Amino acid sequence: MSYCRQEGKDKIIFVTKEDHETPSSAELIADDPNDPFEEQGLILPNGDINWNCPCLGGMASGPCGEQFKSAFSCFHYSQEEIKGSDCLDQFRAMQECMQKYPELYPQEDDEDELEKEKQNKDEESSVTQSSDTKEESSS
């Protein structure tokens, strides 16, 4: 016996083997590209950039959002042979802005450095503890 159960936002449908053997009669409805509530990708059907795309990770908002939009737009619409080579000023402005907010825009080098420092402290701590243990056992 097949049935459906709602759990919060999820709808769970239990079906039998017989249900799977019967061809589906469901009709698919084509997505409306003009539906403002329909999730879109990075590039909208009209070719514009979708600044609300979760794939941008919020970069289009925040203190450097305008600089990001300027640099990203320049790159996206660039017609240069080396795409984006005409956007250096915009990317430089974005980078300068991001350096003003290191807590919001950590650089990979900074993250690597912090991780290495943490590992070094952990290693120093374990070396100190093991040498203390050796001194106690030898006395």
From Swiss-Prot:
GO cellular component, one term: mitochondrial intermembrane space
Biological process, per Gene Ontology: mitochondrial disulfide relay system; protein import into mitochondrial intermembrane space
Signal peptide: none
Stored InterPro entries: CHCH, CHCHD4
GO molecular function list: protein-disulfide reductase activity
Pfam family, one: CHCH
Span(s) of short sequence motif Cx9C motif 1: 64-74
Keywords, alphabetical: Disulfide bond, Mitochondrion, Oxidoreductase, Protein transport, Redox-active center, Translocation, Transport
Residues annotated as domain CHCH: 61-105
Region (Disordered), start-end ranges: 102-139
Coiled coil segments of this chain: none
Motif (Cx9C motif 2): 87-97
Record field: compositional bias (Basic and acidic residues): 115-124
Disulfide pairings: 53-55, 64-97, 74-87
Compartment(s) where it occurs, according to its Swiss-Prot or TrEMBL record: Mitochondrion intermembrane space
Subunit (UniProt): Monomer. Can form homooligomers.
Record's comment describing the protein's domains: The CHCH domain contains a conserved twin Cys-X(9)-Cys motif which is required for import and stability of MIA40 in mitochondria.
Function: Central component of a redox-sensitive mitochondrial intermembrane space import machinery which is required for the biogenesis of respiratory chain complexes. Functions as chaperone and catalyzes the formation of disulfide bonds in substrate proteins, such as COX17 or MICU1. Required for the import and folding of small cysteine-containing proteins (small Tim) in the mitochondrial intermembrane space (IMS). Precursor proteins to be imported into the IMS are translocated in their reduced form into the mitochondria.
Name this polypeptide is given: Mitochondrial intermembrane space import and assembly protein 40-B
Source organism per UniProt: Xenopus laevis
